[in-house]
From Swiss-Prot:
A cellular component annotation (GO) from this entry: nucleus
Comp. bias regions, Basic and acidic residues: 91-103
Compositional bias annotation for Pro residues: 120-133
Subunit structure: Interacts with the complex composed, at least, of APC, CTNNB1 and GSK3B; the interaction takes place with the inactive form of GSK3B (phosphorylated at 'Ser-9').
Region (Disordered): 1-149
Main location as per UniProt: nucleus
Biased amino acid composition, Polar residues: 1-19, 74-86
Location(s), subcellular: Nucleus; Cytoplasm
Modified residues (N-acetylmethionine): M1
Protein name according to UniProt: Jupiter microtubule associated homolog 1
One Pfam family in the UniProt entry: JUPITER
UniProt entry keywords in alphabetical sequence: Acetylation, Cytoplasm, Nucleus, Phosphoprotein
Residues modified to Phosphoserine: S28, S31, S82, S83, S87, S126
Length: 149
């Protein structure tokens, strides 16, 4: 004879039932068709539940290290973009403005030379003709039902 395991319902003193009626949280999951005031449990570590909302008061530690870099700098320090650094400009921290102007004029002169050169037009690629479809195609299994005489 085969026995089946049965589970208790919501009330532990009620008769045995084959359904599990109690949710993992322990509360009831019965819906009677009207809104009941329910209390949502407060989650301490919300990961991406409000990505468009206001930032959290206590972000996780990984968010502090990734997003906090810009905030951690003091307002007195100056930053330069990588494009500024590669163009030959530099920040004038010691008051050497005449050297900075010389670099600036040299840079503008080199830009003028670059602008005077005509840019060759990109060659237009010829349209690629699609491969011709074969006149006979085999079915996926490879076996053809074609009867040859």
């Amino acid at each position: 004879m085969t026995t089946t395991t049965t589970f208790k319902g919501v009330d532990p003193n009620s008769r045995n039932s084959s359904r599990v009626l109690r949710p993992p949280g322990g509360g009831s999951n019965f819906s009677l068709g009207f809104d009941e005031p329910t209390e949502q449990p407060v989650r301490k570590n919300k990961m991406a539940s409000n990505i468009f909302g206001t930032p959290e008061e206590n972000p996780p530690s990984w968010a502090k290290s990734a997003g906090g870099r810009e905030d951690s700098e003091s307002p007195g320090t100056q930053r330069s973009n990588s494009s500024e650094a590669s163009s030959g400009d530099f920040l004038d921290l010691k008051g050497e403005s005449d050297v900075h102007e010389n670099v600036d004029t040299d840079f503008q002169a080199s830009l003028a030379q670059v602008e005077e050169k005509p840019v060759p037009a990109a060659p237009v690629p010829s349209p690629v003709a699609p491969a011709p479809a074969p006149s006979r195609r085999n079915p996926p299994g490879g076996k053809s039902s074609l009867v040859l005489g």
